[in-house]
Amino acid sequence: MLRLHFHRLLVFLILSCATLPATAQEPFRKVLFLGNSITKHGPKADIDWSGDWGMAASAEARDYVHLVTQGLTVKAGAAPETMVKNIADFERAHAGYDIAGKLREAIDFQADLIIVAIGENMPALKTPEEQAAFQESVTKLLTTLKAGRHSVVLVRSCFWKNAAKDQALQKASAAAGGRFVDISALAGDEGNYARSERPFKHAGVANHPGDKGMAAIAAALLEALGKK
């Protein structure tokens, strides 16, 4: 039943992308994904995670990165070149983060589509000053990655809804000329969590998006690309 449900979601995802409104945007040739464990996490035995893709999809092809890539491939008729990086260290220590040094490979990649999905590992933003500092760091991250090019930038809100973080991400996205993708409603559907699809020994892994949640994230990102 789960396999059938996922296949239905995948068909919907691909058809939605294939019927996106036509825009002047040329097909994306290079796509950069920056995120945390939801974007990519290597095997880690002590938390019972054996994958090397977005946690906690059941397979590489079912995480949001690969679903978005598949959707773009269907629309363009050719697969874009992709780069996927986990920047959880930026979330945890964004102040003074050496963007130019630590993310040199990502900058030199010169992506024409940049998708940023961060925030979940950020400590709580307890004051307006902390929120402003995070916003400033994310704005610097985005502008450095764009490096003066007219890249399309998507900034996704947190999967685990958090108003303070999401507001900072939205403002940073606007400051860098990006598009903010609000997925906060997904957190209210228990079916979007991996724990609803199969058992996990580690509660943290189980709290990540499962196949349904990953498909919903991908659908939101692809829909945002269809908006002028």
Write out the residue ranges for each language-model feature.
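Bacterial N-terminal signal peptides that target proteins for export
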Residues: 1-10
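Boundary at the C-terminal end of the N-terminal hydrophobic targeting segment
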Residues: 22-24
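Conserved SGNH/GDSL esterase-like catalytic core that processes O-acyl groups on lipids
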Residues: 27-32, 40-128
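Second-shell loop/turn segments in exported
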Residues: 51-59, 126-131, 155-159, 203-208
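Charged helix-capping and loop-helix junction motifs
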Residues: 99-100, 130-139
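Active-site segments of SGNH/GDSL-like serine hydrolases
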Residues: 115-123, 141-171
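Catalytic His-Asp segment of secreted/periplasmic serine-dependent ester chemistry enzymes
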Residues: 158-228
